[in-house]
Amino acid sequence: MVLVGRGDGVATGKFGFPSLAGEPAFVLHAGIFRGPAMCRPHLMRSDMTPNPIIERPEQYRFHNGTKAVWPFAVEEYEDRVAGLRDIMEMHGLDAVVLTSMHNVAYYSGFLYCGFGRPYGCVVTATECVTISAGIDAGQPWRRSHGDNITYTDWARDNFWRAVASVTGLGKAVGVEADHLTMERAEKFNTFVKPKRGMDISPATMVQRMTKSAAEIALIKQGAQVADVGGYAIRDAVRVGAREIDVAMAGRDAMEMEIAKRFPDAEYRDTWVWFQSGINTDGAHNPVTSRKLKQGDILSLNCFPMISGY
């Protein structure tokens, strides 16, 4: 960290991250990240020459490694996308932009982790492409049935530019209206410029409600995993045990069982709701460190999350 005087007695911070060339690849100056493409006269190399302006892409494809084993067979995803294309044809849509976790995962197999960043899946008559942030590198492509485009952070709204690169401009496009905020809906109109838009969420919901044989088989295994968690909780219940201890016993047992049954899956979000005594008065009261007492009412819920199911 280098403190740089402004000449008025106030110090500002400048923080440089070294690049492969040995110079700062990014500079934080006055609270703003700037890189070589946004150089200002005061951002100099060590030899006092200006940093060069570097072209930065809006998007790229990072197909790192090989495709992973998806939650379902290729044929399952092909059937789902074919069903969506039937809906598109029925309503005269050229493309559909999916943005919710459940729809992106349902049609592509990729269960994203947003952390404040937009993710999506664009389906056209010929393509099924997930759109992901650079921070996730090659994982979205490996976990997607279909192609993947990575958008960069060099400019605001590169997500929507990546979306538009697949949908094309001036097309009839379906979106999940119940998932788009007013801000994102405005960005969709600005960057995709649809000649006609349609809320596709009711139709996709109906499609997802009809479970395939493969989905039913997975859900049955999930119920069996929940039983494993329930038995572990029963064994952990005793006077003096904390709610958190009991909940962790059930969660750990379920995660181990999921890993045994689904060795190629990604493991996330499995959890237990365990409440005791006064904490049972609300359905969504969080787990606490309250110690169990004789005569307590106990409430437990096991949530084994297997690829979003």
Task: Report the location of each language-model feature.
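A composition/biophysics-driven feature that prefers long, compositionally simple stretches
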Residues: C39-G229, V287
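Extreme N-terminal basic, low-complexity initiation segments
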Residues: V2-V10
